[in-house]
């Protein structure tokens, strides 16, 4: 896909996020929106995956370590064709397979259940080690939150990844600077993030995580990197794409009411129309 096509898909992903969280009356729109461009690039450009064959052995693996941003993952999966887009409106509903955190047993395309912060990267490291042991060609990607990396388990897993020289592993940090109870550097600062990963023998790339040119260049660089895992520090805007949600910590885990939903969808519809005119 070219940049414009990716932007169009990302806008649809954002619409799905807002629609699902509004329908659920609960969820995490802020971090889902900030990572929407990453989700889009992974599923529509980077990863070797097939919605018609979700268990194929050589597929690339993705672990959403910051599992609370499941609305973003679900919306990308729906756009890719893993399940109907209409099912997004069942998020968190009784009997729905789309619950608040990813469930590998019930959701097509989900490689690992997640939710407890810090654990997803460990699963991803294990998958990458297994790939090396099997001489398999697949790559493993995991998306972490910047607040999540306050968890010690993240660094235990990173130590192992660097030690094992897992060049089939890409760790992406959604660095939107906000977590549920405030700015991350005021709660428990993880900065400098890049220096920490470098200390564990990672190749580190800093990018604007809402810019497809930079996203594309970073993933190409990661694929060309040999002998060490890659960490992409994606500097993003929490709530990206919906003006009143951007950089507002209150939208970490709050669903829009009917009026806010209408405003958000109108903004995204206009953004989509503008992209179609390019």
Where are these regions (language model features)?
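Cofactor-binding active-site loop characterized by glycine-rich and histidine/acidic residues
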Residues: 17-21, 32-163
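Glycine-rich beta-alpha junction loops
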Residues: 68-69, 73, 176-177, 211, ...
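N-terminal hydrophobic or amphipathic helices/low-complexity stretches enriched
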Residues: 1-13
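Thiamine diphosphate
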Residues: 109, 113-116, 121-224
């Amino acid at each position: 896909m070219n940049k414009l096509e990716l932007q169009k898909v990302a806008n649809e992903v954002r619409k799905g996020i807002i629609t699902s969280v509004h329908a659920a009356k609960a969820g995490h729109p802020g971090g889902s929106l900030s990572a929407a461009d990453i989700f889009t690039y992974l599923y529509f450009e980077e990863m070797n995956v097939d919605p018609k064959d979700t268990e194929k052995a050589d597929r690339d693996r993705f672990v959403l370590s910051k599992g609370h941003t499941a609305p973003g993952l679900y919306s990308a999966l729906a756009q890719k064709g893993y399940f109907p887009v209409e099912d997004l409106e069942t998020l968190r509903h009784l009997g729905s397979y789309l619950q608040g955190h990813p469930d590998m047993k019930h959701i097509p395309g989900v490689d690992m259940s997640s939710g407890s912060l810090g654990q997803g990267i460990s699963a991803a490291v294990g998958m990458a080690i297994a790939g090396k042991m099997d001489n398999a060609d697949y790559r493993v990607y995991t998306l972490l939150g910047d607040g999540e990396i306050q968890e010690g388990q993240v660094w235990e897993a990173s130590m192992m990844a660097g030690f094992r020289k897992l060049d089939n592993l890409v760790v992406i940090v959604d660095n939107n600077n906000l977590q549920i109870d405030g700015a991350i550097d005021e709660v428990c600062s993880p900065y400098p993030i890049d220096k920490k990963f470098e200390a564990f023998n990672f190749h580190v790339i800093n990018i604007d995580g809402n810019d497809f040119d930079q996203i594309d260049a970073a993933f190409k660089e990661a694929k060309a990197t040999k002998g060490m895992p890659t960490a992409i520090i994606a500097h993003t805007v929490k709530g990206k794409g919906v003006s009143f949600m951007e950089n507002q910590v209150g939208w970490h885990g709050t669903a829009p009411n009917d009026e806010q939903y209408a405003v958000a969808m109108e903004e995204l519809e206009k953004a989509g129309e503008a992209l179609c005119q390019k």
